[in-house]
Structure formats: structure tokens, C-alpha cells
């Protein structure tokens, strides 16, 4: 996490804690000629536009006070989206019983992607139901885990 991302995280936490929101991620990066500070938040039942506005106004005021960014930037506060990667233990817990896709660094059985129902997460291992059988994946070999969205 960059220094600016850490500052933004520290500044936003009080409003998140007060409202029982979860900080999913903070990004500070340049895209084209513009800099973006993106804050992704969530809560049980999902984030609303009003929630995003509340956090955005609060964080904008705090950033103006501290002024840690020398140049102009665009502040965005939003939900992480339905297909956000699962990173934290809580993300995995929320997705028990749901379909996920696992991408690996090193292939297993000549495959680097597996899809199945998440049945357990231990912190070190992900266990899914794959083709009717339990399959374990060591987190050290997992590059990405995301929910499977079916419409």
C-alpha cells in the first residue's frame, strides 16, 4: 500500500466504523493524464449511493485538511462490485456455499483455473466442491479468487 493509500485508509476508517461499513480496498493510481484515489466500501446487504456520498464527503473534507496529495486527483467512493476478488477471510466466509473461480500460479492436473462451490476456508486453504469431490487449494498457490456471477 502506498503512502497516500495508507493516509486515505487512516482518514476514512472513523466514518466506516461509525456506520458499520467495511473497507474493501484503496487504490491511488494514474490513468491517462488523471490521478484517481478510489475507495471501495461494503456492508451487509450492500452499499447504497447515499452511503457512498456520506463517505466521499467525509473523506474529501479530511483530505482537504491534511492535504497529502500535491496535484489534482479524482476521489471515487464506490462498492467493489459483484465480481470483486475475494481477499479477506470475511470475503470467503460470506461466499461459503456459492460458486467461485480460483486462479493458480502453478497448474494442478495441467489446469490453472478451477470453478466450484466454496465449502470451506481455513486461512491457509480453500476447499471447493469440484465435479462432486472436495478439492483443496493452498493459498500460497492461489493468485486470484472471485465469485462466479450467473444471470
UniProtKB/Swiss-Prot annotation:
A Gene Ontology cellular component where this protein is annotated is: cytosol
PANTHER family in alphabetical order: RIBOSOME MATURATION FACTOR RIMP (PTHR33867:SF1)
- The protein's name is Ribosome maturation factor RimP
* NCBIfam families, A to Z: PRK00092.1-2 (NF000928)
Q: Which family does it belong to?
A: Belongs to the RimP family.
Q: Does the keyword Membrane apply?
A: no
Which residue windows are coiled coil? none
User: Is the Cytoplasm keyword given for this protein?
Assistant: yes
Q: Localized where?
A: Cytoplasm
Which UniProt keyword terms apply here? Cytoplasm, Ribosome biogenesis
Q: Which HAMAP family is this protein grouped with?
A: RimP
Gene3D superfamilies, per the entry: Ribosome maturation factor RimP, C-terminal domain (2.30.30.180), RimP-like superfamily, N-terminal (3.30.300.70)
Among SUPFAM superfamilies, the record links this protein to: YhbC-like, C-terminal domain, YhbC-like, N-terminal domain
